[in-house]
């Protein structure tokens, strides 16, 4: 479960980086790769709105996934601590000296 969520988390992070780099900035950044002029079927404003909405959605998914991963990780860690404590108790009981 954690492995799948971790893969999804990394995928969302990569997509988020790509979408942020494609957004129009003051210096036009990488957004000029898509043509840069308003002569196409889709206007620059429409593309900007799509990229803004995509950024918001990906950021929300990223944060939710991070919280779920942190929650699962803390539960897994507490389970590990309880198992270690059980092993230590069993070893302490088994290591008592035998009277002759």
Swiss-Prot record:
GO cellular component: plasma membrane
Pfam families: SecG
ATP-binding as UniProt keyword: no
Predominant location: membrane
GO molecular function, a single term: protein-transporting ATPase activity
Keywords for this protein: Cell membrane, Membrane, Protein transport, Translocation, Transmembrane, Transmembrane helix, Transport
Membrane spanning stretches: 1-21, 54-74
Superkingdom of the organism of origin: Bacteria
Membrane topology: Multi-pass membrane protein
One Gene Ontology term from the biological process aspect of the record: intracellular protein transmembrane transport
Signal sequence, start to end: none
Locations listed in the record: Cell membrane
Entry's family note: Belongs to the SecG family.
PANTHER family listed in its UniProt record: PROTEIN-EXPORT MEMBRANE PROTEIN SECG (PTHR34182:SF1)
Stated role: Involved in protein export. Participates in an early event of protein translocation.
Stated name of the protein: Protein-export membrane protein SecG
Organism: Rickettsia conorii (strain ATCC VR-613 / Malish 7)
